[in-house]
Amino acid sequence: MAKEAGGDNSADLFAVHSTDVKQKLGYTSWDDFFTRKFKPGIRPVASPDDDDVIANACESAPFRMAHDVPLKAKFWIKGQPYSLIDLLHNDPWTSKFEGGTLYQAFLSALSYHRWNSPVSGKIVKAYNLDGTYYGEALAQGFENPNSPDKVAANNFQAFLTSTATRAMIFIQADNPKIGLMCFVAVGMGDVSNNEITVRIGQHVNKGDQLGMFHFGGSTHVLLFRPEVKLDFDMHGQTPGLDTTNIKVREAIAHVE
């Protein structure tokens, strides 16, 4: 499991409660292990003094990038477009992101599941939104004519951004070239507890904790306004289902 997080030894990577493997490293439950913390310094913040550098909010694999995201999109039988009104559940600030940029990435059950702020700024709105559990897009997962598609659940992550339980965190970035941006934590399958650990009015530095997923695999979204010009760094990968994790707090984009 530790290899998913970028290493070979859990005791070297994580702030374990005990080094005794027979005592399960001191974890008292699956969720206690699932929400484990990295040791200080294991995931340094990319360019902490450069507000033009955006950090990866989760230890996650790039899934999809979308530009000129529409306010409202139809859900077709094939394909899953993003729809801001549905993703943000018609939040009063939804229109601010019309025509903007959306980045989505996937966290497997073995990933590190705490969220970290991609930018320095002020938390201006944060709340949880109820949604479905085990939601699915029935048109996805039939690409293999001989057997069920084993990654069907991963394939309709875009659909889940508008249907699953999620946490919305709006940040007014210190960098005026970024301004208002939004982090959306999306529960997948049975993930029904997106825990927000910041409060409205709080200032966070890039890399500070925002919250965490509980219990299972998840996905997340970074949303930017159309005025923000970004150069994304996928670390040599093309977003999709076959990507590997980019470390949390590593550089994920640069503001032009």
Give residue spans per PLM region.
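Contiguous, well-folded functional domains in the mature portion of proteins
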Residues: 1-256
